[in-house]
């Protein structure tokens, strides 16, 4: 048994308040992309379908002896380049292929996890993505926003601070709205440029009445896992 899933283009920020946002397939007027997976998710194929040819062509094939997760395919340069999210080396990372599925280069690598691609600036050839586990002195589940060039160079952290960050990148990839919080801190929203420079504080929650009523933040603590090593 297998499952087919249509790849679609990322939603634009200018459409975020629309009741019905347009869903557009990833591709062009003649071709679209889909993911074909086995029921056990040991086998995942990224495929293309050309209108009128009535055939599904595998472009990127993933084979593992364990369950795999997937993320949406990013299509660049008029369909001539593809960015794939994959867990093939045990960590979730990004890889660049040409339209025929030939490997071009690895974009990210290391003992950390790429969560999602938020924006690809095709003109500048820069990818904005969220990831966690890169900062050893922070909670490994806290996500940050990063940028990296399509060729794998220029990796840079955009958001800062030991918080869980929920960033949004504008459609032109010039600005970032970073909503960040932690269980023992006051939530805050700030405006950054695409290099991580803080431009302004948009809003910081007011907990004064809550604190006056006797509220106390939960206390964070650290314990060892069953292996006696992992915090």
Regions found by a protein language model. Name each.
Residues 1-12, 19-25, 29-37, 42-48, ...:
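Non-catalytic accessory segments flanking enzyme active sites
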Residues 74-79, 121-130:
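Repeat-blade elements of multi-bladed beta-propeller folds
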Residues 137-138:
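Generic long, charged, amphipathic alpha-helical segments
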């Amino acid at each position: 048994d297998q499952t087919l899933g249509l790849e679609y283009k990322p939603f634009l920020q200018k459409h975020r308040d629309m009741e019905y946002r347009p869903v557009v397939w990833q591709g062009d007027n003649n071709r679209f992309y889909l993911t074909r997976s086995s029921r056990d998710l040991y086998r995942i194929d990224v495929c293309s379908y050309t209108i009128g040819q009535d055939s599904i062509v595998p472009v990127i094939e993933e084979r593992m002896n364990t369950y795999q997760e997937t993320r949406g395919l990013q299509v660049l340069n008029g369909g001539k380049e593809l960015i794939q999210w994959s867990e093939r080396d045990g960590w979730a990372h990004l890889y660049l292929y040409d339209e025929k599925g030939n490997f071009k280069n690895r974009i990210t690598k290391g003992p950390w996890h790429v969560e999602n691609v938020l924006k690809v600036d095709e003109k500048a050839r820069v990818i904005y993505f969220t990831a966690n586990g890169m900062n050893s002195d922070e909670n490994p589940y806290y996500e940050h926003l990063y940028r990296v060039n399509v060729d794998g160079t220029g990796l840079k952290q955009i958001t800062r601070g030991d918080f869980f960050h929920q960033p949004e990148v504008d459609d032109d990839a010039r600005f970032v709205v970073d909503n960040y919080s932690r269980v023992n801190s006051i939530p805050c929203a700030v405006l950054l440029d695409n290099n991580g420079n803080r431009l302004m504080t948009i809003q910081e929650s007011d907990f004064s009445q809550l604190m006056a009523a006797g509220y106390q933040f939960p206390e964070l603590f650290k314990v060892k896992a069953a292996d006696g090593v992992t915090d």
